[in-house]
Amino acid sequence: MLTDSVCAYCGVGCDIAAEVENNTILKVSARPDGEVSEGKLCVKGKYGFDFASSANRLGKVKIKKSFLDKHSLFLPSKIRTMLASYRVDNQGYIHPSLEEAYLLIAWKIQQVRMQYGNFAFASIGGARGNCESSYVFQKFTREVLRSPHIDNCARVCHAPTLKGMRSIIGEGAATNPFRDIHKAEFMIVIGSNTTEGHPIVANKIISAVKKGAGLALFDVRTIPLAKSAKYNAIIPFETNLMVLNMMAHTIISEELYDSTFVQKRARGFDAYKREIMNDPYADPEFFQKVKGYTYLTEMIKQISREYAAKRSLILWGLGITEHLDGSYAAAAICNLAVLTGNIGKEGAGLMPLRGQNNVQGTCDMGCLPYYNPDYEKPLVEGKKTPDIINAIGEGEIKVLFNMGEDIAHIHPNQTKIHRALEKLEMLVVNELFDNEITGFADVVFGVKSGYEKTGIYINAERRMHLSQPLIENDLPDDWEVIQGIAKALGEDMGYRSSRDIWDEVQVAAPKRFSGASYDKLTQKRVSGLQWPVFEEETPILHIDSFRTKDGLAALRYKPWFLRGMVRELLHEKRKHFYLTTGRVIAHYNNAAQTKESPKLLKRHSEDVVLISKEDASYVEGKERVVLKSRYGKSEPLKYKLTDQVRQGTLFVSFHHAKSKINFLFGDEADELTKTARFKSVKVCIE
């Protein structure tokens, strides 16, 4: 018997069918008629299920004995007596009941609130949990803790996409379903190694190319999709915004834009045109001055012409967002779609390739400091994750709740984060496994995984899937832990099931979910529904108007500024290597789940640095290398000489915490959202 659910990994959100025996997953496959998977899964989807039955899974709850000792003089006698009866394990933890842990946490919350006030609390969530837990998490933070400081892992991925897209077209989500890739005549992939980051989307792209569609790539290195591309534009580090502006410059100067569409559906064109035509960095001819990249002048023009003339899609990933100008680059992509009318119709639109399986849904639920559910503005805007870290370091925030986001591994400036976490008066973590963040935690709750619970996940195309358990365990779901803490504080949230929560979400976020009931989603278990859902779903956005106040797109120009690699190339002064980071197909983010699968761990057991063959002299005689930046250094790493990266540039994955890759990054971030600049850092090789 096969049980249908949804994959627990990336933002593609593939439908899966699992064979289960004796409460153990034996095999995972895709339905041949699957709307998203189209009958295919990547290696993570196929083989990355061993974590669910791993002996390394966390138990229900554990509390550090040192935390209790620190508070022994102040604990109420009832709590002290209850917890004193538990044996301390070899790692220094006790394992009480859930209710006893809730009471301890509630006592500490009340103590901190009396001394420091409500803004001494903060919450940071991941996006691997379901929408129901994300909704309860933000509600708990805002209404029970009475703090505005709520954020999620979008801070280190697609927060700039949300910001940039909303500034132009009023909505920060994909405009079209993935199936429209098959209907496109031309596609641009920029800042996305789709084959490894979103493999099933890459399958669709390759299929479309085989049927005659054109493909253009913009990246700082050669990626597997290059084999299928008509144009493979290798660009200097930190030039996304520049090349996107150059495309717009070409489209306007050669009068390739859709004047009728622009006149009817947009505002601000005249000012936009004036600014772009007077910006020397927007003219593709600028690349004639950049040694090693002169070919880009003509290639950018050719790509622009095809994009404007054909039914076209633009797909992008973290190679766009994780930069100083990530939000502006996302906005520039939207400008191109509006200029050419490549939006609001089949086979033409915008596809940000969201990272985690529910990062779209987590944002939709309001786990952001500047948005409530349905992207409504809160009365008080909270702190973003980097600001939360700073506030912890400065003693302003005393208690942190963390729901599935390993900030002690995945986020930048790890030296600062580790120091900050040590200053907290209490850190409460919900997780599946011990990882870097649990080592700092005072209380750790083991919770259900995505394969053990009911809940809604929203993928990168706005598609909602209602998952169902593949196997059973007695661990709580995230929302049950949160509700338990609230109840111990005297705040009964009143949820009996995930359905109860979703019924409330439909009322709290009616612009997207009013018609998306559990019953309707159960009927559409395999295919799902794309929000907004009223009587019917909405596969394509912006058909008649944009989701702005006046229904018009707002063309806005942001110039690129000279810096980094381009500045060095202009002056022919190479001083550093430029490092970019990313995923490999076998693992997902901190590898907490994938490393539990022997087949996946065998494929990628450690992070490896890719170095250009032209830079072989820098590693001659070395078995391993250490990367060093102004912020920190990595552990000794394996390396591989390759043609996939250009001279003076490096690539490395970040999946294994022992590599200390994220110790290389500092606080440089997107100007508007503070998303870390993970895609460019100067390093030297030791």
Residue ranges and their predicted role:
Residues 2-15, 416-417, 423-426, 430-435, ...:
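Phosphate/diphosphate-binding loops
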